[in-house]
């Protein structure tokens, strides 16, 4: 839970394209700032090489966390209703740092922007490097700088979305902060939660972060172009994925070579066709 990981800061939105207002908003967690972190540590009677330490939050921390999440869930449902009314397919991309979120989104925008106008909300602790990169690829990108907060929240997404002309896009991608723990807990109002892990992270990644992979509708196994170079065992990886996340659609992809992307795009097109009408120019209706 994020109230136990030291998250507390001011979040700001920096944006270009469709400028409305100053593009900054303050976001703080008073509960995060004011509560001490109490942990109950496990038994240390075993030898150092055998110790497993279990850390459990106290009741006060649990109550605070439940309150934070309850508020976030209400705001996420509000986001979801708003996005659905606009006919938007909204995706929340989660991964560890360096798994290739930005590269994949950049490739998607380059391939699909003409037929599927796309905006991106980018979450990072600092800098707007990824947002600038995506703008160069043709995306409308809004940067949310979270400071010490290691995830995006529904309120941040709502404020960032206010900077976008949602009537002229049909897909919204949320690139979450690179982290496979805290973002899992926070619903942002998305239609699809897309979890990425790269071949460089090891076949057991899903076993180490089961909650994240269990929460995904889609899993993208990225950087397939270097799978052989890192001796990636695809069969073992798929076995682990199916064990942890049998509900998810899985695609093996490479942003560099384009491997697997057509199947991923077809999945998105089919999903959007089933749930929303395609974006139609009113002049042609």
From Swiss-Prot:
Effect of loss of the gene: Disruption of the gene abolishes hydrogenase activity but does not affect urease activity. The hydrogenase activity of the mutant can be increased by the addition of nickel.
Binding site for Ni(2+) 1: 2, 5, 7
Keyword Transmembrane helix belongs to the record: no
Residue numbers spanned by region G-domain: 90-251
Pfam families in the cross-refs: cobW
GO molecular function terms attached to this record: GTP binding; GTPase activity; nickel cation binding; zinc ion binding
Region of interest: Disordered: 16-54
Entry's Gene Ontology BP terms: protein maturation
UniProt feature, compositional bias: Basic and acidic residues: 27-36
CDD domains recorded: HypB
Binding-site residues, Ni(2+) 2: 150-151, 182
Keywords for this protein: GTP-binding, Hydrolase, Metal-binding, Nickel, Nucleotide-binding, Zinc
Biased composition (Polar residues): 44-54
Residue positions binding Zn(2+): 150-151, 182
Gene3D superfamilies, A to Z: P-loop containing nucleotide triphosphate hydrolases
Superkingdom, taxonomy of origin: Bacteria
Functional note: Involved in the maturation of [NiFe] hydrogenases. Required for nickel insertion into the metal center of the hydrogenase. Exhibits a low intrinsic GTPase activity, which is essential for nickel insertion.
Similarity-based family: Belongs to the SIMIBI class G3E GTPase family. HypB/HupM subfamily.
Name the UniProt record assigns to this protein: Hydrogenase maturation factor HypB
Species the sequence originates in: Synechocystis sp. (strain ATCC 27184 / PCC 6803 / Kazusa)
